[in-house]
Amino acid sequence: MNYSKAKYIMGAAKVSQLPEDTGVEVAFAGRSNAGKSSALNTLTDQKGLARVSKTPGRTQLINLFDLGNNNRLVDLPGYGYAKVSESIKRQWQSEMENYLTSRKCLNGIVLLVDSRHELKEFDSLMIEMAISFDLNLHILLTKADKLNNKERAQANRMIESFLKTFVSTDKISYQLFSSLTKMGLDKFKEKLDTWYQ
């Protein structure tokens, strides 16, 4: 797949506004500041494709990017400490759940987790949802360039031990990644390619 061909299609506030439910979609999810926009820009080799914001939680829409042949990348709203009311946060969450449960063309989720921190409630929720809806999930442990070898091993172990608490994790994979140094980029593309086949 040539990810550098990605083009912005639209932003939708609601799942009902999304284009026809055909083809293949891969969704990117992550807490605010997990490095989601940077990862999308690195993957597509386009600096400004997804806006990298200094204000966490700027992504309030479901943003879609076309890869050609009815394949799409989907940028889900950044979740976390966005400066919005609880009711808006709940609205985002219900739209996200609606997307994950109702979108038939969704073939996988990329969950971005800051490798320097423990898994947060949102991360656990996304992993649990992926398992319960039998979805492919690839966890990107971002900002790995900021870790030494010992810390990288710890980050891998953290995910490993968390996944051991579930019975069915055969559709879940994970890796270290850095948008800055492009560490893990080839491995990440290979994983996505299998989902778009």
From Swiss-Prot:
It comes from Francisella tularensis subsp. holarctica (strain LVS). One of its GO terms (biological process) is division septum assembly. Keywords: Cell cycle, Cell division, GTP-binding, Magnesium, Metal-binding, Nucleotide-binding, Septation. InterPro entries: G_ENGB_dom, GTP-bd, GTP-bd_ribosome_bio_YsxC, P-loop_NTPase. GO terms for molecular function: GTP binding; metal ion binding. Residues 22-197 form the EngB-type G domain. Gene3D superfamilies: P-loop containing nucleotide triphosphate hydrolases (3.40.50.300). One of its GO terms (cellular component) is cytosol. Mg(2+) binds at residues 37, 59. This is Probable GTP-binding protein EngB. Pfam families: MMR_HSR1. Its cofactor is Mg(2+). PROSITE patterns: G_ENGB. GTP binds at residues 30-37, 57-61, 75-78, 142-145, 177-179. Belongs to the TRAFAC class TrmE-Era-EngA-EngB-Septin-like GTPase superfamily. EngB GTPase family. HAMAP family: GTPase_EngB. Necessary for normal cell division and for the maintenance of normal septation.
